[in-house]
Amino acid sequence: MKDPKLRTNLLLQLVENAQEGIVVAEKEGHDTILIYVNPAFERLTGYSSEEILYQDCRFLQGEDTKQESIKIIRNAIDDSNPVRTILKNYRKDGSIFWNELSVTPYYDEVDQLTYYIGIQKDVTEEVTLQEALDSANQKIAQLESEIQSLKK
């Protein structure tokens, strides 16, 4: 696409209409401050952009800040590396959702780290199904063990 205006408009429409939550954040000290969120992010979290812009994105973690995935994200951001992980987040109404979060550092034309681009996908259904499968497999293993002990 040769027309830069057309390309910019297409990219804007792509981000605004994406099904996944997309955010842009900038690093300020130990904080990662949201400077843009798309409509899908607002739908996913229940927060409007007016409520959350220029805040650190940790508000989605609620009180549950001891998750291993949070350490993974923080380390990647501190090292300016891309990362993808799943973490537990909370919507504005307090309900839990499992968030597959991808964070990618963005460098400007002089190779300065300027922003982080985050993409959020609600994977609650997948996590719930995996937990149910793991539980069923544990029960099967326990039953197999009990059957083996009865055979002796």
Task: State the predicted function of each range.
Residues K5-V37, K152:
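Sensory modules in modular signal-transduction proteins
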Residues L53-D64:
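PAS-family sensory/regulatory domains
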Residues Q112-V123, A132:
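PAS-family sensory domains
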Residues F41-I52:
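PAS/PAS-like sensory domain cap-loop motif
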Residues E63-S95, L143, S149:
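Terminal output helix/cap of sensory domains in signal transduction proteins
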Residues R84-K88, D93-S102, Y107, I117:
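PAS/PAC sensory module
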